[in-house]
Amino acid sequence: MTSKVVFLLLLSLVVVLLPLYASAAARVGGWSPISNVTDPQVVEIGEFAVSEYNKRSESGLKFETVVSGETQVVSGTNYRLKVAANDGDGVSKNYLAIVWDKPWMKFRNLTSFEPANNGRFL
């Protein structure tokens, strides 16, 4: 009788914990929302994205703020940000940027930067 009770308890535990494990496993490598887009680290990444875009495109965008964002843990962290910037005309526009950051290697790379449109992420 005791072994049946132990077996049922273990089986119940597996049934309860298995969905939690599967849920956590599905998030590994997935995108997670950034709860505080005013965090200095997030703002620094946003400023880097605009600055790097300006260097590559010989543009003159001026960073304003990070509107929203997500992170993805890879070999480092991918930041997918919607940033507001203007090109000096006084009109703020949103841009989508992806930055790969590996702070322990002092490595940061702008992977993508484009005008935001309603059909995309964020």
Curated annotation (Swiss-Prot):
Pfam families for the chain: SQAPI (PF16845)
Cited Gene3D superfamilies: 3.10.450.10
Subcellular location(s) of the protein: Secreted
GO biological process: cellular response to heat; defense response; positive regulation of seed germination
Signal peptide stretch: 1-26
Residues of the site described as Reactive site: 29
Residue intervals of the Cystatin domain: 29-117
Keywords tagged on the record: Glycoprotein, Plant defense, Protease inhibitor, Secreted, Signal, Thiol protease inhibitor
Primary localization class, coarse: secreted
Residue span of motif Secondary area of contact: 72-76
Glycosylation sites: 36, 109
Any single Gene Ontology cellular-component annotation: extracellular region
A GO term, aspect molecular function: cysteine-type endopeptidase inhibitor activity
Family: Belongs to the cystatin family. Phytocystatin subfamily.
Role: Specific inhibitor of cysteine proteinases. Probably involved in the regulation of endogenous processes and in defense against pests and pathogens.
Protein's name according to its UniProt entry: Cysteine proteinase inhibitor 5
Organism (species): Arabidopsis thaliana
Gene for this chain: CYS5
